[in-house]
Amino acid sequence: MSWKVPMLVGLVVLGTHIWTINKEFLDVTKDLDYFVASVEFAVAQFNDNNSEENTYRLLEVGRAQKKTWTMIFLMDLEMGRTICKKHDENIHNCPLLQGSGEKKVHCVFQVDARPWFSHFTVLTSTCVPT
């Protein structure tokens, strides 16, 4: 009988943990200020870390979520290769490359936002060509 109580407590704790993992990220609106800033940071980091000469620009935001009790954002972004080079002055309105140079990527980012310090960190990023 005495072994049943710890077993029951263990099952309750495990069940609660599994339930909270599923609820860890909640949907947010795509125009939330800190989310928008995190998206811009993720795209800039992608361009900085990408070995290609051309920059990419945001085409579409898919998933927009925030981790409960934090400022960690989870986002799905579709980006397209532009005609602009990394060192061009105004890369925000660059047209997309067409034809043989056309390329799109789908990325999932987790960004930790500390906007009150103007500090953002990409925690994870995974990108695949589409």
Swiss-Prot record:
Nucleotide-binding recorded as keyword: no
Pfam family, one: Cystatin
Disulfide-bonded cysteines: 84-94, 107-127
Gene3D superfamilies to which the protein is assigned, alphabetical: 3.10.450.10
Signal sequence, start to end: 1-23
GO cellular component: extracellular region
Keyword terms, alphabetized: Disulfide bond, Protease inhibitor, Secreted, Signal, Thiol protease inhibitor
Name of the protein this chain belongs to: Cystatin domain-containing protein 1
Source species of the chain: Rattus norvegicus (Rat)
